[in-house]
């Protein structure tokens, strides 16, 4: 069962979604298959990340991503895919990175749940 979100939060998410690039799980899988460089960033909270993550994902929670992304060697034109639980927090974070000058940022619609459903990731046992 999904979480119930406030109308203001949902409005913020929709504004961000209108301003960013999104990909679905099929498009994400194609990005992985095409062999190009891709930086995957998990923007979930630490306890969510600890429970399981996409293999090789960098963990930069939504609360610190703007502050900490430049601590990592990621070029402004690198293909970056952000994910959270379902695609809401990652959309907001993607908008922030776009404003910071990163030009090839995507939010994975469906997030962690879509990764697990597609067998691209699994929760820790």
Model-identified regions with their sequence ranges:
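Short, surface-exposed ligand- or partner-binding patches at beta-edge/loop junctions that are enriched
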Residues: 82-84
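Rhodanese-like catalytic fold shared by cysteine-dependent sulfurtransferases
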Residues: 1-39, 46-79, 88-125
């Amino acid at each position: 069962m999904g979480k119930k979100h406030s109308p203001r939060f949902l409005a913020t998410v929709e504004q961000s979604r209108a301003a960013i690039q999104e990909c679905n799980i099929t498009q994400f899988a194609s990005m992985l298959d095409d062999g190009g460089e891709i930086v995957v960033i998990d923007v979930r909270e630490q306890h969510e990340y600890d429970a399981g993550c996409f293999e090789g994902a960098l963990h930069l929670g939504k609360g610190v991503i703007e502050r900490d992304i430049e601590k990592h060697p990621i070029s402004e034109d690198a293909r970056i895919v952000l994910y959270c639980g379902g695609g809401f927090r990652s959309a907001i974070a993607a908008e922030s990175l776009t404003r910071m000058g990163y030009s090839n940022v995507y939010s994975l619609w469906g997030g962690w749940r879509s990764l697990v459903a597609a067998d691209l990731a699994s929760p820790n046992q």
